[in-house]
Amino acid sequence: MSILPFLAVAFGGAAATLLARRWPVASAVIGAAALVAALVAAASIAPGQELAVAGGTIVGSAYGRLFLLLGAGTGLILVVASRVALGASWPANLPGALLASLGAAGLALAVRDATTAVAATIAGGLAGVIVTLAGPPRPRDVAVAARELRAIAVAGSLVIVATAWVARPLGILAQEPAVFGLAYLAVAVGVAMRFGAIPFHLWAARVADAAPEIALPVLMAWGPAALAIVAIAWVDGSIAPVLPVAGQLPVERAAVIVVGVASLTLGAVAAWIQDDLEHVVGYSIVQDAGVVILALAALDPSVWAPSRTWLLSLLVARTAFAAWTMAVHARFGTRRVPELAGWARRSPVLSAALLAIAVASVGWPGLAAFEARASVIDLATDDPIRGLLLASVFLPLLYYGRLFLVGFGRHSSATANAVGDRPRRPSEPARRRLPSGPVPSPWSWRTWRSWDEATQSVRWMRPLRPLPGMTSAALDLNRALLVGLLVLILAGTSVGVAAGGFGLPAAAAEPAPQLPGRGE
């Protein structure tokens, strides 16, 4: 099957979910159902199947299918976990933003024209603004959303202008190295801005303050990742082939490498010194994005497979980290690290989840994600910088270690009174006597509008009458445990992706799409 059904489900589900925002329960049900449908539609995508649309072509790929499968699957778990953990205060715009972002990413990964693909990723990025402005907008939220819009607009404009410029016939300018150097630099800067890489991280820090922690992967990871994949393919097809004419672009490459190195090293240090968990998640994404920026600096077709492997590992691991942060905040009522002393002793499930996230994001030699990151660093840099960067990949142990050190300390006031992970059974409800009077007819549709009347009308259903109350009570008593288990599933998925599961190495090694963009 082509990718068209997925696009229809994603964009249609996003519209339906956002239109139903006035009815939170209906919006949540529609969003969850649409994500399930998107998951099924993504699984049915046939790699290599082309479809002519509006004078262009969209084509499915194994990597695009895996990208969308993981996006819809992790998104579904995010929605369920946030709804269970936060109740009525959950970000109701999240399902719509997720679906719109995934639809835009699917379109960007399927079209063959680079400029169209970039435009799709920009449209997907705008969906994140919806999450930032969830609920009645405050002046601070509006200011942050304006910063976010500005970053998306500037980054998108840089990449669109660069790809469109190189795509046109250049004539005599085709012999000028500056033409290709400026276009390459504009694309790299655009990707860096979308990720919030250093030194473009200030807008990302403001977004981390205002947006719900559960929405950070949508804002800072999934959308920018689609743009990065398109950019790496464009560099592979439009810049690398003209290097014999344009030269090796040493100045431009050096500038891109500086951004990548700064993000990879300083991002980890910034995450280590932050006291707010949202900022820890945000800067951890910035650090991982440094590897993506280095992939753009490599100017080598060999970077294609490892960069795409690393990108998917980054996405799933950071999605799990954001979900872990949300679960901690919901359970202990704070997201400040110094106030979370003893959290790990209170919740072994969340401890196991954080350990799995650390394994997925740091790894060890032989793990697919670890080797992919090492390959990107090796292709982009030379000694002695290469050796320093290979050592710096272990810097995340600083902030993971700090979280565990705090977690196994003495209980703080926030964690001392929090519920643990032990399952709890609700007390037996008091038996309710059946109301006197005539028994409702089971053949009347009005009977089935009320659970009490339905169970009264059918004799064998009468023992099930307390079931809704018991289920609701059990959910309330074990809400924290259920959310922790959902986060643990996400964390385990991130380890599977980092280990090369789900067919990731083969999908990432697919040839780059033939994106037009080389000047004649």
Q: Where does each model-flagged region fall?
A:
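Alpha-helical transmembrane segments of multi-pass membrane proteins predominantly involved
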Residues: 1-520
